[in-house]
Amino acid sequence: MGLRTSVLLVLLASSPGLTFAKTTLPIVASHHQDVMIASASLTDYTRSDPYASDGRPRSIMVSGFYPTTQCRRKKIEPYMPPATASFMDTKFGAYGLPNGSFQSLGLDTCMTPAKRGGCSKDLPVVLFSGALATSRHLYNAMLQNIAATGYIVLSIDHPYDADMVEFPDGTIVTGVDIESDAEIELALDTRVADIEFVSKQMKNASAIKDLLPGYAGGKNALKMAVVGHSLGGAAAAGAMMSITSLKGGVNLDGSMFGPVLTTGFNDPFMLMGHENKTQATDPSWKTIWPNLTGWKKEFEVKHSAHYSFSDLPLVISALGLDGKLPAQVGELLGSIEGRRMTGLTTTYVAAFLDMVLKGGKEDAFSKAGSRFTEVDEVA
């Protein structure tokens, strides 16, 4: 956590502009659809921000990803907004990434859908929460791939929890130190409240207009699931316990905390961990397992590490840096090539979402296992 302050000082001192994106991160999902992306700031006036000393209402940043079957005009969108990209260049420069790496990246997006069809299609919604001290933008490519399989995805940045959140008016909120049990509990509770707030925005015409321009809405938008990585996975479990509108949840590599461990819930839930992260090694997974009384599965991904479930492996592969970075990067990202890891995560998450939100068959997991032999079904 101490890296945040020094990174911010470097960022403020340099403040470089975003260069033209030269490397496009690919959509590797098997069911390819063009995806539109938009971001908006949303404010929950019903609660105060627990991290702000002046009692201001809680404001968050959210990105919306939604597929279109008919795209009239495409655009290479910068992978991250300018200040965030500069911040990440400095942060991950410590791992050997060349300066300007994140500023050089782009996403192939749909800028203008066809007048008929396109983004007006009625689709289920996936809510996403990332890791502690991690920008939502470090999951943009993965979430674009999930959206391409036929879902609206709403990705949430949790200010003061994420290492940096950049708002449209130029405001930058940096993270606070979150280390003690009490601090983690506050962060978790705040995340669950953020997720609940965003889940209600599909009934808010103003929010939909900002996050999903051109989207007409429909009953399927009220079919929702939640996916989270790391602390976001813990938040996904907490949200499943408290938000009745959620039909299922996925925890990617996150240890869990709080009353959900003993209370549990009866809706579908999937655990996917990196190599050696299972019920046998994570007490929270072992504790919650018997209290998950609905459909459940646990998977272990061999040769993966904690941040394998982010865009970082794909970024490194797309930049041609596989095998060229310090050995300690493997402790962070594992050894699975980036396109394959993104495809693996997308395939398993989409199989779960199809099952709980679209009535898909459970045998999709067996088919995925045949393709991705790194994945072991633990339970």
Task: Please give the residue ranges for each predicted region.
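Fungal secretory targeting signals
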Residues: M1-A21
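Active-site machinery of serine-nucleophile hydrolases
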Residues: T68-T69, P78-P98, H137-D177, K302
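Domain-level recognition of soluble alpha/beta enzyme cores
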Residues: F20-V126, G330-E331, G338, K358
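Primarily recognizes the serine-hydrolase "nucleophile elbow" in alpha/beta-hydrolase
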Residues: V198-G264
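Alpha/beta-hydrolase active-site loop
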Residues: Y160, E166-K219
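Short substrate-entry loop that stabilizes the transition state in hydrolases
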Residues: L105-E166, K277-Q279
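Alpha/beta-hydrolase-fold serine-hydrolase catalytic core, especially in secreted/extracellular enzymes
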Residues: L312-A379
